[in-house]
């Protein structure tokens, strides 16, 4: 039981770090002191460290169980997980193609961020969050072990919480333009028109 609590606490640490450094007040304070590149380095480094801590907290080392212990393999779950993971990866690539130029450039220059509503963003406001959830669900299907499920469920929960806070930040930043966009595109699933 304690091992699950450790995973939950370590995953929560990642969530607090990620949301904390993403909050406008903290972000602006760091940018004022160390610039956009400094913020980017701090955010990336601390995100990697806290996610690595959460990952290692699982103390799970049987990543190739399907080779070393093939009797544990559940083909339907495994194949479903591969399909779900590939779907999530493709969705992440599609979303990144649309935002990568704008978002990455905005962090490295003084350009003002633009509201992206093209491509996959025309149907889903947060496709990267959906892609993350699909990949985490795939991990549960491919690795049907309780400790892996706890880790993935913690990160899925944080993803939804992060999407909620991101949504609030976008409404504040873009105002009516974003409120209009919300009418046309679904939160995390495509809006049926």
Predicted regions and their residues:
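Hydrophobic cores of alpha-helical transmembrane segments in multi-pass inner/ER membrane proteins
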Residues: 13, 50-54, 83-91
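A generic, lipid-embedded transmembrane alpha helix
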Residues: 42-59
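Transmembrane alpha-helix boundary signature
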Residues: 58-66
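Cytosolic-biased juxtamembrane loops and peripheral soluble domains of multi-pass membrane proteins
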Residues: 23-39, 67-193
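Alpha-helical transmembrane spans of integral membrane proteins, capturing the lipid-embedded, hydrophobic core
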Residues: 7-15, 48, 156-157
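Feature marks short, highly hydrophobic, charge-poor N-terminal signal-anchor/signal peptide-like helices
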Residues: 1-5
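N-terminal signal-anchor/start-transfer transmembrane helix
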Residues: 9-27
